């Protein structure tokens, strides 16, 4: 009887990793589908954030300090809008995050503003320009957001979305196929006979792997005879980076998967 030496899971993982080859193929992908992918190129911000000076707090803006008081306009400067041709003799209420027009460079927060009879009284108010969020304060145009070979996590994904990146370059995902082997197996969707067994392993493996950024194919159920096994691996081997086989891997004389792999591949470790 042949005895096989077991190895630890840690050792098995180390062996597999040591024989792996980093893919150099690059592809473009929609940002929404890039979670956990690896960037194949450096990504820089195409814009400044914010793109214009903006209000860090709710408050008022005025154009200059020449006047002692400013009538408060009924117009409110809101986020998501562009306001032009504002009267420099007026004070304008502005909401947090709203863009500040280029000729209104003085900001007064609500707490520091003194309003009397619909006038902003400058002598009793306190200008606080430190509360203006400057153009590019969060991100500078051409600033590096993602380095080459960096993993796209959910934080990086949101960062890229904030600068309008729609498509990014990543390394092509590994192509993985999953197959079950066994004469007794039948797809769980089909009606089985008493001597048959529903194939559950493949479904479990496929759904486990869905959390990884890979291209995943269900390769069906393979009958455990040498001719079919040989035909399967010869036709599929060059099409996939990895084929995971469930079942049909014992060391009995009737196991044709192990027989074919032992004859035609390099076995890295026994289990």
Model-assigned labels for residue ranges:
Residues 76-88, 92-93, 105-107, 206-262:
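N-terminal small/polar loop signature for handling phosphorylated ligands or for N-terminal nucleophile
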Residues 163-231, 236:
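Glycine-rich phosphate/diphosphate-binding loop of Rossmann-like nucleotide-binding domains
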Residues 259-271:
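Glycine-rich phosphate/nucleotide-binding loop
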Residues 93-95, 147, 178-181, 245-246:
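Short beta-strand segments
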Residues 2-165:
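Phosphate-interaction motifs
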Residues 102-104, 154-155, 187-188, 251-255:
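Short glycine/serine/threonine-rich phosphate/pyrophosphate-binding segments
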